[in-house]
């Protein structure tokens, strides 16, 4: 059975051009008119970025059309401004160290410590909002699986589960299950959780084709909406736009913070308004344990009446290299571990010395009110750009290829949490969740032993084991390793451990897959 599934997946990937099959080249656009070219050249010359057109006369008509279409929407003066600010940030004299404090108790909760009745109340409220078609999901899925040894979008990656389901499939089936639960609980038959999927230039086509091949994982295709994050030119250390070839500027995605501009530019916010969406859950594709549109999180955030809420997990120890969610000068913010001195990193909680004072690790798992997303045009221009120094293949002034062996330029990025400080504390909240239940990121290649396919698979299988034991089943195994004692529970029959009563009193031999009642 597993071999048959694997063959099917391999055939599908081949059909998607993810296994080396060449695509037919798309026709190149027509070149600009003489007047259009003159206007473009003047725009870039005035910004002292005219070198992007150095080799214009050498280009074919198709290459001219392609370069023109790429350069036309770029504002080189804007690139100059953000490059200058990012490369040469202003230094404030006598700048005081920022005041860092944990969130006040009024803005936080923990599923680890909270009573079950309160959690159940939030879950019920969240599921009711889902039943009223007021909840949507935004997935950040622009990354490729390069570090995993795959050219496919990261969401297509198979972490090695017995079912061989991809990350996309796990998440899509959780949405399907939630719709089913809301339908059944509130006697509806038309519950919809729209799934907005942000791709990037390199992943857009392959992602959409993957969803087509997989029949949208049982979801209505009209409620799965793809959109693309923006790109920014890569620049030299001196602020000059780098050219990848004579007919193409080097560009890179604008970071996960580009989601806000993309939501507006692609019409997603308008679509949400037309659907009556009020509550939005946003997350990254690489977390195999993510509780998509988590009713408990939605209910908690809605009850608080906040514009943004975020999930966190407890920092493992003082040295774990994670960003921390906290108050910075009285505003919600995320502070990188490099900004924390050892004294602050090791400080313990005033009420419980076994806990770190600053322990809310950022897992990029957020709630937004629709009103906040609708206000994006009022503040998106204030988001800072961050510099990521990279080795960027390009051409030199003579048009010769340059393959640098050390960073030669920068990619400009925005971070999704850069808007947090725009809010007052009363409009922000944080929910601490169990790491083993909700966070297992896929970052590294197989065999790394940390945040890799093996740890992702292990965490899914151990969660399934806990689900079954919670339902009253007994797990046995002939294998001596922990992974051999795990069970894969399909999201189609259980979102968070519910619906498994039929296993009460039964003995399940692991490893096993529970796909349906039997």
Feature locations, PLM:
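Conserved beta-loop-beta/alpha segment of the NTase-like Rossmann-fold superfamily
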Residues: 216, 221-320
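Short acidic, glycine/serine/threonine-rich loops at helix termini
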Residues: 149-152, 206-212, 236-241, 292-296, ...
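Catalytic core of tubulin tyrosine ligase-like
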Residues: 276-281, 289-293, 298-480
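Composition-driven recognition of long, low-complexity, acid-poor segments enriched in small hydrophobic
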Residues: 2-18
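N-terminal glycine-rich phosphate-binding loop and ensuing alpha1 helix
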Residues: 27-222, 233, 244-261, 269-270, ...
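Residues at the starts of beta-strands that form the adenosine-phosphate
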Residues: 194-195, 223, 307, 427
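Short loop/turn segments at strand-loop or loop-helix junctions that form parts
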Residues: 138-142, 229, 433-435
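Structural beta-sheet core signal
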Residues: 137-139, 197, 226, 282, ...
